Amino acid sequence: MIDVMQIQEILPHRYPFLLVDKITELKVKEVVRGYKNISISDHVFMGHFPGHPIYPGVLILEGMAQTGGVLAFESMEDKVDPKSKVVYFTGIDGAKFRNPVRPGDRLDYEMSVVKNRGNMWIFKGQAFVDGNLVAEAELKAMIVDK
């Protein structure tokens, strides 16, 4: 498992834009699973939507992207310092939002490698709440020098 303090050593994101709390499983160049606890105190709920809080789909995608970024960094064969590199997401295809995500939910991410060639990655991303699919997409990324 990789906790939030270790995630911050891998990814440049910080509160309020670090959208993965823990990595629960990681198989190099294959799959990563992690989650974010969705809280009513998340700043996004001040405006999305008052009286009917729904976690934005674009933030679900970003959380999947960050989870995939951890997998990409941990799968690098040359093990460079992540502080000298950054993962840029270059494309999102086939994004679908199946069910709303609300405060109190645990948002589980699963990112599977579809293809990897050098610094280029294609992931199949899925997000779940209580085992139910809430979002899915194919995400493309590349690791570049800062």
UniProtKB/Swiss-Prot annotation:
Protein family: Belongs to the thioester dehydratase family. FabZ subfamily.
InterPro entries associated with the record: FabA_FabZ, FabZ, HotDog_dom_sf
Signal peptide, first to last residue: none
Protein name: 3-hydroxyacyl-[acyl-carrier-protein] dehydratase FabZ
Catalysis performed (reactions): a (3R)-hydroxyacyl-[ACP] = a (2E)-enoyl-[ACP] + H2O
Predominant location: cytoplasm
Active-site residues from the entry: H48
Top-level taxon of the source organism: Bacteria
EC number(s) given by UniProt: 4.2.1.59
Organism: Campylobacter jejuni subsp. doylei (strain ATCC BAA-1458 / RM4099 / 269.97)
Keyword field contains Lyase: yes
Transmembrane stretches, start-end: none
One Gene Ontology biological process: lipid A biosynthetic process
